[in-house]
Curated annotation (Swiss-Prot):
InterPro entries: Membr_insert_YidC, Membr_insert_YidC_N, YidC/ALB3/OXA1/COX18, YidC/Oxa/ALB_C, YidC_ALB_C, YidC_periplasmic_sf
Assembly: Interacts with the Sec translocase complex via SecD. Specifically interacts with transmembrane segments of nascent integral membrane proteins during membrane integration.
Lineage, opening ranks: Bacteria, Pseudomonadati, Thermodesulfobacteriota, Desulfovibrionia, Desulfovibrionales
GO molecular function, one term: membrane insertase activity
UniProt protein name: Membrane protein insertase YidC
Keyword ATP-binding in annotation: no
Subcellular location: Cell inner membrane
GO CC term, one of those recorded: plasma membrane
Family membership: Belongs to the OXA1/ALB3/YidC family. Type 1 subfamily.
Gene name as annotated: yidC
Organism per entry: Oleidesulfovibrio alaskensis (strain ATCC BAA-1058 / DSM 17464 / G20)
Keywords, sorted A to Z: Cell inner membrane, Cell membrane, Chaperone, Membrane, Protein transport, Transmembrane, Transmembrane helix, Transport
Compositionally biased region (Low complexity): 58-68
Annotated region described as Disordered, given as residue ranges: 43-70
Length: 536
């Protein structure tokens, strides 16, 4: 809910800014003021064959030869990340991204998606009938660390036993993706047929930077074709419990995520926030194992950045993790356009400016009609005022006379409002697109203040540290307001006068990329209004 408040504020402000005077004139209204030990087998493919070549794996020990081994750490190193597992259960201890740092400062640490606090809640742990196997089972590990340099895939096989059930966890790693695939094989070792509940866990601490009001960590899941989320406050109070139909679920912020996706269809999903750790569970409610036989269960884990191109190539509907709200159909092409312009400009700030110019050109005809209608309405204000004075006690007659006046002069009272309102979905789509574009994270525009070494717009996903752009944006709004026909009513005029101040304070902590968009849009609007005034 907290992440939607800025959007609601912008929408309400825009409606007040654009529509109040037209709606009040149209209706004849009088204006009113104003959220143990383990088993794993590690094998790496080293041949010069293509990646599609089968991965060589060591066979797991037979059930009769199972012997627990001493627990240790198992490291998986790929070009994209470094992961450290505990052989006691195959749970994650660390997961560090190699291409992303915590800040833009030199020597900043790499982004850690599984911290020691989260590791204490057993991320990628296996639950058998609700019991933590990483604590209660005996585990065997026979293998080495994995180092994948792009020439092949690799696997880890963790084997454990508990309560007459042997579980073999095979984790598959691809050096070109953040997706980790797992196949769990359950085998009866006690000669008893049984039904078991198999659950997989995933844990992480907050993925958002401290003080990131527009980049909140939340729990999310994909169910019945819809992306759904819940805030940290709701998680603390009630948690999340979805009884069926979840394709994937986990934790995410604007730029990173850690989610699980069952391979064999949608399953129940649960999530809680306790002690600063987000913990989610996907559980298969009933898995049948015949006496002496086996059953299998598959799941995928995506722990990494929300890069649109990577997610589009992923299974399990993971591309739906990029959620832009109601205006997704606008946000996605706008973000694609942003990346296209960046491929030529080499600077995301410049790409935002080019995209803003393009959007402005597309809406140029609508803006022309709006400005023209506003000018016509301004000319009719004296006559409208006379009608109000004459029929002030008879609202119905007054409205009829006002409408007759508009009809006589062929003026549409909504003509200045509607073209502007049509642009609001585009603004909101671009707002969400820029807010969730990981491409803008740590992307510089003007890295230093001109003629100085002072760091300025070195990160378009962060606020302007000196508030220069939001203040200039407020000034452009004030100038734009001066060029716009003023409302006839003094109360309306006062409301409009304060709008630049409201917007300036609202944009002070907005990501710089969003402020640059709105600033450039204002400058272009001023240019268009000036041109219209000269033409008229």
């Amino acid at each position: 809910m907290e992440n939607k408040r800025p959007i609601i504020a912008v929408v309400l402000s825009l409606f007040v800014l654009i529509g109040w005077s037209y709606l009040s004139e149209f209706m004849g209204w009088t204006p009113a003021p104003a959220p143990v030990e383990q088993n794993a087998t590690a094998v790496q493919q080293k041949a010069s064959e293509p990646v599609a070549q089968p991965v060589q794996t060591a066979s797991a020990p037979a059930a009769s030869s199972f012997a627990p081994t001493e627990g240790r750490e198992v490291k998986v190193d790929t070009p994209l990340y470094t992961a450290v597992f505990q052989s006691q259960g195959g749970v994650l201890k660390h997961f560090r991204l190699k291409k992303y740092t915590e800040s833009i400062e030199e020597g900043a640490p790499l982004v850690e998606l599984v911290t020691p606090e989260a590791a204490g809640k057993a991320p990628m742990g296996l639950l058998l009938n609700g019991q933590p196997t990483w604590k209660l089972a005996a585990w065997q590990f026979e293998g080495d660390d994995l180092k994948l340099d792009g020439s092949g895939k690799g696997e880890l096989v963790f084997v454990g036993e508990m309560d007459g059930v042997r579980f073999e966890r095979t984790l598959s790693f691809d050096p070109e993706t953040y997706l980790i695939s797992e196949k769990v094989r359950l085998t009866d070792t006690a000669g008893v047929s049984r039904d078991v509940r198999l659950g997989m866990t995933l844990s992480t601490t907050s993925l958002s930077p401290e003080g990131g009001a527009y980049n909140l960590t939340r729990m999310a899941w994909y169910q019945d074709g819809f992306h759904q989320e819940t805030s940290a406050d709701d998680l603390r109070e009630t948690g999340v419990k979805v009884d069926e139909g979840v394709n994937w679920g986990g934790v995410m912020c604007n730029y990173f995520m850690a989610v699980m996706a069952p391979a064999e269809g949608a399953l129940p999903f649960k999530g809680v926030l306790e002690g600063g750790v987000y913990r989610s569970v996907v559980e298969n409610s009933s898995l049948s194992i015949a006496s002496g036989s086996s059953a299998e269960f598959g799941i995928g884990y995506y722990i990494g950045p929300k890069e649109s191109d990577r997610l589009a190539a992923m299974p399990y509907h993971l591309d739906e993790a990029l959620n832009y709200g109601w205006f997704t159909f606008l946000a996605k092409p706008l973000v694609s356009g942003l990346k296209f312009f960046y491929s030529y400009a080499g600077n995301y700030g410049v790409a935002i400016i080019i995209l803003t110019i393009l959007v402005k050109l597309l809406f140029w005809p609508l803006s022309q009609k709006s400005y023209k209608s506003m000018e016509q309405m301004k000319k009719l204000q004296p006559m409208v005022q006379k009608i109000k004075e004459k029929y002030g006690d008879d609202r119905q007659r007054m409205n009829q006379e006002v409408m007759e006046l508009y009809k006589t002069y062929k003026v549409n009272p909504a003509g200045g409002c509607l073209p502007m309102l049509l642009q609001i979905p585009v603004f909101l789509g671009l707002y969400q697109g820029l807010l969730n574009a990981i491409e803008l994270r740590h992307a510089p525009f003007i890295a230093h203040l001109p003629f100085t070494d002072i760091v300025w717009l070195a990160d378009l996903s962060a606020k302007d540290p000196f508030y220069i752009t939001p203040v200039v944006m407020g000034a452009t709004m004030l100038l734009q307001q001066r060029l716009t026909p003023a409302p006839a009513d003094p109360t309306q005029a006062k409301i409009m006068m304060f709008m630049p101040v409201v917007f300036t304070f609202m944009f002070l902590n907005f990501p710089a990329g969003l402020v640059v968009y709105w600033l450039v849009n204002n400058v272009l609007s001023i240019g268009q209004q000036w041109w219209m005034l000269r033409k008229s």
